[in-house]
């Protein structure tokens, strides 16, 4: 059974999962990894979830305020051996529910063209592709997405 726990970026399980995420992205992004890494710092993220299978941390994600009503989904990751089991969807839906509780009405995110499984997850969860925002404007390998959040 999967349990999703709310925490913050000081959580050691979250930090360990993010280390694995960064290793994966370093391979996928190649030379562009340094650009993306600059926007993926976790020190000040107050809203983090970690998914556990029994006592094993298997996935994570975070939300970060983008504007008064908009949150940004950050640091989504599931261990490879646990993918395809609904964990990423559970993490995402928990983050969205938390965002609604905090008063946000919209969610945005950036993922990479080299992450087709992430793009499929977000599309399946109701996200639509939007023009690249903020620091991702003009970045060829970025895919930005958005979803209206409802209670």
Give names to the regions the model predicted.
Residues 55, 59, 86-88, 126:
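Conserved phosphate-binding and hydrolysis motifs of nucleotide-dependent enzymes
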Residues 2-74, 79-80, 92-93, 132-135, ...:
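Acetyl-CoA-dependent GNAT
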Residues 78, 84-97, 124:
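Conserved acetyl-CoA-binding loop-helix of GNAT-fold acetyltransferases
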Residues 69, 85, 101-105:
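Short coil/turn segments at alpha/beta junctions that flank glycine-rich nucleotide-binding fingerprints
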Residues 7-10, 105-108, 112-125, 131-151:
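C-terminal "cap" of GNAT-fold acetyltransferases
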Residues 92, 99-110:
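Conserved GNAT acetyl-CoA-binding A-motif
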Residues 17, 21-24, 98, 121, ...:
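Alpha-helical interaction/dimerization surfaces of two-component signaling modules
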């Amino acid at each position: 059974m999967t349990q999703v726990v709310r925490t913050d970026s000081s959580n050691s399980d979250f930090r360990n999962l993010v280390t694995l995420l960064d290793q994966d992205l370093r391979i996928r992004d190649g030379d562009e990894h340094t650009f993306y890494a600059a926007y993926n710092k976790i020190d000040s993220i107050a809203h983090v979830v970690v998914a556990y299978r029994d006592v094993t941390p298997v996935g994570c994600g975070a939300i970060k305020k983008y504007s008064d009503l908009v949150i940004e989904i950050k640091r989504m990751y599931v261990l490879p051996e646990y993918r395809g089991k609904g964990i990423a969807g559970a993490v995402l839906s928990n983050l969205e529910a938390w965002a609604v509780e905090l008063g946000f009405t919209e969610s945005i995110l950036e993922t990479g063209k080299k992450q087709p499984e992430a793009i499929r997850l977000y599309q399946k969860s109701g996200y639509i592709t939007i023009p690249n925002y903020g620091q991702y404007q003009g970045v060829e390998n970025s895919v930005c997405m958005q979803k209206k959040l409802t209670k």
